[in-house]
């Protein structure tokens, strides 16, 4: 019986290179040798383009006119090798090919439907999905399901690859997980105390109402208070969404804890649950003016030499998130004009604020106070360019 090596040698001699490579590709596909299959497809592309079959490690020169089709051939070879592995549910083998060409979507679609069966498989899938960025939300979901909230909090705090939207999606999962845990434990506690199981649809706020003294007797907490504090602080980065409303309820719960269990935060969130509750409610449109005044006073009273600029950063960011661009620019000019932009965190810079406002005069004024001639000149130029646009907007042609 002819072995594959003899068969390939005969094909090269009698049928030519193309026939031999076609046979090679079929053989490697049957063996599910994904790496070999990929390189065989690349070899086929090299022959198609008239390039040498053997590529020296140090001589990878490809003529300029062939560079694009050769690159496309490599990308298609990676897709085919990756898809072959995905067809066998071998995500670990498929992912390097899709990662190489920066096309995670097909792997993400498979990960969305997968459920780890063994601890080792779970670890591998979390590594690919979360830490290597194939599908961060799904990977974080597995961390919550298989390793628990404590590990999920640590993972979120340490960071992982992905977009800002990926982090927001993971944060939403984290808030919901803690909320659901708290709600389940409240229901269980109340069922034992009262002999009646509260409706499953009850919210945390509804479960607390009228039971504050009994539920929090003896310095009791229904969830790990470090988990509660961490998740509430993370929720600062949420947009207006349902999970932000859940964070409000987490704050309401936290406010009832014994003071020993309420860990103080950094300004302007010294009273963690009280201050974050005001912040979240303001974002959600509840008692907005009172909420803004709360944080304005904290920015006004903060001594940058003692506590830094964070109270002002929070206040300016809150104004901007509420769409109050003019007030945000004015607050920035008052409190952050001399702040190092590197300390702004997620607060918009004066450049961004002026751009959204369509008025660059505040940038000019701040640049002069900072002694920045470049920003001063750039602001003047941009202000001059913005004037015709504003005039045209104010007097549209019929």
Where are the model-predicted features located?
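Long, low-complexity, acidic Ser/Pro- and Gly-enriched intrinsically disordered regions
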Residues: 1-99, 105-106, 111-398
């Amino acid at each position: 019986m002819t072995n594959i090596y003899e068969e390939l040698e005969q094909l090269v001699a009698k049928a030519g290179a193309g026939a031999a490579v076609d046979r090679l590709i079929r053989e490697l596909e049957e063996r599910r040798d994904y790496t070999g299959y990929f390189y065989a497809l690349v070899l086929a592309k090299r022959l198609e383009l008239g390039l040498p079959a053997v590529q020296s490690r140090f001589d990878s020169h490809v003529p300029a006119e062939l560079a694009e089709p050769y690159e496309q051939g490599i990308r298609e070879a990676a897709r085919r090798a990756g898809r072959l592995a995905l067809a066998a549910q071998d995500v670990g083998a498929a992912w390097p090919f899709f990662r190489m060409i920066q096309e995670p979507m097909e792997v993400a679609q498979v990960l969305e439907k997968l459920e780890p069966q063994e601890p080792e498989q779970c670890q591998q899938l979390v590594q690919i999905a979360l830490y290597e960025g194939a599908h961060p939300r799904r990977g974080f979901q597995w961390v919550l399901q298989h390793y628990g909230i404590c590990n999920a909090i640590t993972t979120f705090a340490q960071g992982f690859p992905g977009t800002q939207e990926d982090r927001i999606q993971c944060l939403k999962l984290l808030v919901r997980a803690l909320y659901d845990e708290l709600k389940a434990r409240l229901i269980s506690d109340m069922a034992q105390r009262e002999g009646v199981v509260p409706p499953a649809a009850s919210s945390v706020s509804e479960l607390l109402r009228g039971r504050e003294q009994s539920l929090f007797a003896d310095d009791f907490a229904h969830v790990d208070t470090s988990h509660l504090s961490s998740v509430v602080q993370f929720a600062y980065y949420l947009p207006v969404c349902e999970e932000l409303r859940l964070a409000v309820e987490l704050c309401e719960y936290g406010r009832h804890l014994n003071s020993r269990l309420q860990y103080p935060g950094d300004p302007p969130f010294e009273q963690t649950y009280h201050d974050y509750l005001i912040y979240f409610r303001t974002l959600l449109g509840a008692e907005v003016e009172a909420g803004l005044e709360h944080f304005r006073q904290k920015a006004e009273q903060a001594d940058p030499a003692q506590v830094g600029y964070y109270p002002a950063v929070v206040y300016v960011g809150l104004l901007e998130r509420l769409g109050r661009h003019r007030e945000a620019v004015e607050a920035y000019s008052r409190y952050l004009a001399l702040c190092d932009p590197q300390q702004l965190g997620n607060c918009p810079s004066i450049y961004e604020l002026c751009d959204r406002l369509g008025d660059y005069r505040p940038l000019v004024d701040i640049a002069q106070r900072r002694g920045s001639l470049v920003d001063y000149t750039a602001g003047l130029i941009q202000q001059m360019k913005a004037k015709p646009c504003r005039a045209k907007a104010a007097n549209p042609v019929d």
